């Protein structure tokens, strides 16, 4: 085991220890450290009460984030650290938040309330690793397992059902059999979770390296009821073939929602309260069909006439996953679009060497005919029949307006 505490977290823990309080790094930062990953955040837990934490570090350095739950955020060297008092939790009448919390002196009681064993470990330089539920062994085995009784963990907070699949997908772990059985049994409880939290978890799940196997139909039925109840094996394969990462999640959403079509996709994403940018981005990928013809440059220009380069890149990635036998063709199409963009090639009316004022000066009447003339000029340019040069375009426009 090799856990190196981040300097700011280490200093805060030292201060708490010197003041006579037990204190540990806890949760995801311990898990990630044991996996050899760099933690994004360092959360700390302590026997000190919130008011004692604020007194120790000074009110100017403290934000009373959630005093009723024992959490104080401490500012140090430009970073924020959440310090939470050891606690147990009462019943969860809403299936999401505890009705009450009770502060306790023992970190083991605090760890017992957490979701999965890999997240229920604490560490301090003085005492080493505190792992009462076998989280380190589960990390070594590659298993996600609930702390204690799985049904109780999911009854407390139904969002943990999605977190189960998200953590398993993130690390490529298997799910403990009893834990998954409980998750499926209580999947209907996801109805009481806000759609914003569901969308956030689904985004994280779809951002994982290979999330296909973790898209469980018995769970998705309650968070994406719009999806047909058929086998998801094809969608899983397509999603796994697409690039991974948060910036690529739009393309994976499109692969998942493809059976719904554009209108169905929009409705599903609106219900999840996704941003307009996400709704438009995913719907665009769903509606656009792969070109049938191999006219590479022309197809690339037509796509760039409708979409920006990033959307074209997403489309070609999606089509490659949908039609792997045409992957080379779609890769070439993407490269052609990238080349055309780098060359500032004319693919839109706005990129023509003439504009509406030029055409009116050349005798084209304003109104619908003006727009048709510009579109005709663009077609001549992108098909290569005319160069994008002002004199050539005006000469053609004069013929067009006379016809």
Please tell me what each predicted stretch does.
Residues 1-403:
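Catalytic cores of the polymerase beta-like nucleotidyltransferase superfamily
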